[in-house]
């Protein structure tokens, strides 16, 4: 039975049992930055199981694309070494949301396996949780599985309810016992049943896990029964296919055999059992579908996991002797194998191949060199010693080798790696980066008081704020004198502290004769705002009360840019695709600078579309709304959360126009306050990362006015209205080309005339051969070459060398030898001989060569030496 048929029969079976077929969700979990990848079928139903979301159906079935690489669930290092580990796999599942429970789940599973897939009942074993008598009785009394093939598994992980047969979503929340179904391959395969000392063998293979969510676990570990228990089951397509296709390795099923053959074709390998081919076949599936879902290779988060998988595949290709790009050429084979089940793959296959090809080219530049470094280091490692952390770090930092890739190579050669040394090298680099950072005093100042109360969302001026701490050169003090630079901590402030890419506010702290100019605002600790600046007048003491006033003009420009950044982020995703993710940002009064994941330069048309979308939102003049709510409620409501950011239980959600993001920054009250949005630059900053800069409000107006003034000046110079400039510039270019052609013709005539003079005045005969060597003033090298060609034809057999010295002191040399003489005299040798005398070099073909030099004073003697040089060679 083919894998496609197994998948189809599974979905159709549960559809016949009243289940709704739900398409596979993205490998990027929707609005859940805490989870790296979708790694099981239940992920897209998580909020349904917890009661936070309601669906129109109570029974569902799906074939879910899943990835287990990176993060908590990571099978990457095992791929290629075992028969059943994959980075990408398909999870077949059926789900009940408060509808049926254990009895139906067990009966459905048994019916599908024995009646639809026709597996022999005597080959199936099951496990249940030690205390789950209900499931045991259903298997034994209703399904009829003999007691000797039902195994109770207790708490085998060191704690209550810590068992292979007890599932929990997290430390708290829904949980419950599970029942696993195993297939017995027979006594000819080594291994024992689950729970036995030999359970790690390959005889008994788990094919299906039925999870019964019947409890709610609180923080104290207490278990309460759920009023509406749920069912979550998962069966790996690759595993059940191996059973139904009568093979013992997932890599022997039809899904993999064609991909392995394709990998062999592209690497030139004949042995289809080579483990490296299995790695490549596995990795093309993971890489392609990650790109389908908008992830591109990068140096952080999900993008870095993708990069690690790609580079691991390339390394295995290199191991097989393939040093050229090959990985991207497997995409059509993957589409042929899986495109029907997942049409989204076929739709973006060209883009998938493009992204992979770019990553191959990027890593290919360093792979060979890095492997030489690693091979050399491994050759020096004494038996039993690890590869040192410094080499690990060098390969990572300089040659782009993910540390797990290096560890994988070392594992093949039975060498351990010094991870502690690697981490130490990483830490040293971080400390050096911090030491070179802009704000050395921004963090880590000793402070034990209350957090600063921020009131800058609504107020730019706040009276009666109290000084709670003062710092001079990093040391806490009680008083600051006029002229000193210091950091002031207040109990409350309207000043925004640098965070989330937005720069800190500037302004004044005043009281009586005291005046402190705030040059920047930074957090010295989480929740504690440090006002960095200079005391311009008076004396400032801890406990003093001040008036805090933010620079309103600067803040207004900053908030315009920050709000525009949100709109631009959304517009970029609309124009370029959902793979666009923030990689960094800087929002200051002058501009917004936004780094984002994308693998190609934006076209002028794409930039114009982004501008149009953002300015349409500006013109709509919609009110900006900020709400503080629970994090789970925020992401459920569609707020964009950034992967890798740390969020608390309570977050601030900003709605501005069509954008909804988690953001603690300051913003305009209405989109119309942005005024005008204009992109001023777009370029690359790193592999797979683009940077776009834009301006707003009065800055954008000033930019437009400057551009218009420049346009008007150009129109004045060309004596044409601005709207006719393209045509007028084209006319000028045509006129310039015509004049250049006329000039070239004039030079040719002049050169011909000069040639006539040279023939008459500078030609000598050496052993029956005409030799002409002369310096003719400032002549274009191209014209000089034409003259040499002309003179060769007129004088043959002949040797010709012409030199021209320009006003800037550069010498051009052209030498020519007629074809009948190149066996004895070569133009390249001649030009090299002369160029060497004038401080230069030269070379070329035997019949024509060019060179140059810089010593004008030596040129006459060098030219005069040609006659003797030729004579010596005849």
UniProtKB/Swiss-Prot annotation:
<dbReference type="GO" id="GO:0008270">
    <property type="term" value="F:zinc ion binding"/>
</dbReference>
<dbReference type="GO" id="GO:0005829">
    <property type="term" value="C:cytosol"/>
</dbReference>
<dbReference type="Pfam" id="PF02272">
    <property type="entry name" value="DHHA1"/>
</dbReference>
<dbReference type="GO" id="GO:0002161">
    <property type="term" value="F:aminoacyl-tRNA deacylase activity"/>
</dbReference>
<dbReference type="GO" id="GO:0045892">
    <property type="term" value="P:negative regulation of DNA-templated transcription"/>
</dbReference>
<dbReference type="GO" id="GO:0006419">
    <property type="term" value="P:alanyl-tRNA aminoacylation"/>
</dbReference>
<dbReference type="InterPro" id="IPR002318">
    <property type="entry name" value="Ala-tRNA-lgiase_IIc"/>
</dbReference>
<keyword id="KW-0963">Cytoplasm</keyword>
<keyword id="KW-0820">tRNA-binding</keyword>
<protein>
    <recommendedName>
        <fullName>Alanine--tRNA ligase</fullName>
        <ecNumber>6.1.1.7</ecNumber>
    </recommendedName>
</protein>
<dbReference type="GO" id="GO:0000049">
    <property type="term" value="F:tRNA binding"/>
</dbReference>
<feature type="binding site">
    <location>
        <position position="667"/>
    </location>
    <ligand>
        <name>Zn(2+)</name>
    </ligand>
</feature>
<dbReference type="Pfam" id="PF01411">
    <property type="entry name" value="tRNA-synt_2c"/>
</dbReference>
<feature type="binding site">
    <location>
        <position position="562"/>
    </location>
    <ligand>
        <name>Zn(2+)</name>
    </ligand>
</feature>
<keyword id="KW-0067">ATP-binding</keyword>
<keyword id="KW-0479">Metal-binding</keyword>
<dbReference type="InterPro" id="IPR023033">
    <property type="entry name" value="Ala_tRNA_ligase_euk/bac"/>
</dbReference>
<dbReference type="InterPro" id="IPR045864">
    <property type="entry name" value="aa-tRNA-synth_II/BPL/LPL"/>
</dbReference>
<dbReference type="InterPro" id="IPR018163">
    <property type="entry name" value="Thr/Ala-tRNA-synth_IIc_edit"/>
</dbReference>
<dbReference type="InterPro" id="IPR009000">
    <property type="entry name" value="Transl_B-barrel_sf"/>
</dbReference>
<feature type="binding site">
    <location>
        <position position="566"/>
    </location>
    <ligand>
        <name>Zn(2+)</name>
    </ligand>
</feature>
<comment type="similarity">
    <text>Belongs to the class-II aminoacyl-tRNA synthetase family.</text>
</comment>
<keyword id="KW-0648">Protein biosynthesis</keyword>
<keyword id="KW-0547">Nucleotide-binding</keyword>
<dbReference type="InterPro" id="IPR050058">
    <property type="entry name" value="Ala-tRNA_ligase"/>
</dbReference>
<dbReference type="InterPro" id="IPR003156">
    <property type="entry name" value="DHHA1_dom"/>
</dbReference>
<comment type="function">
    <text>Catalyzes the attachment of alanine to tRNA(Ala) in a two-step reaction: alanine is first activated by ATP to form Ala-AMP and then transferred to the acceptor end of tRNA(Ala). Also edits incorrectly charged Ser-tRNA(Ala) and Gly-tRNA(Ala) via its editing domain.</text>
</comment>
<dbReference type="InterPro" id="IPR018162">
    <property type="entry name" value="Ala-tRNA-ligase_IIc_anticod-bd"/>
</dbReference>
<dbReference type="InterPro" id="IPR012947">
    <property type="entry name" value="tRNA_SAD"/>
</dbReference>
<dbReference type="GO" id="GO:0005524">
    <property type="term" value="F:ATP binding"/>
</dbReference>
<keyword id="KW-0694">RNA-binding</keyword>
<keyword id="KW-0030">Aminoacyl-tRNA synthetase</keyword>
<keyword id="KW-0862">Zinc</keyword>
<dbReference type="GO" id="GO:0004813">
    <property type="term" value="F:alanine-tRNA ligase activity"/>
</dbReference>
<dbReference type="InterPro" id="IPR018164">
    <property type="entry name" value="Ala-tRNA-synth_IIc_N"/>
</dbReference>
<dbReference type="Pfam" id="PF07973">
    <property type="entry name" value="tRNA_SAD"/>
</dbReference>
<dbReference type="InterPro" id="IPR018165">
    <property type="entry name" value="Ala-tRNA-synth_IIc_core"/>
</dbReference>
<keyword id="KW-0436">Ligase</keyword>
<feature type="binding site">
    <location>
        <position position="663"/>
    </location>
    <ligand>
        <name>Zn(2+)</name>
    </ligand>
</feature>
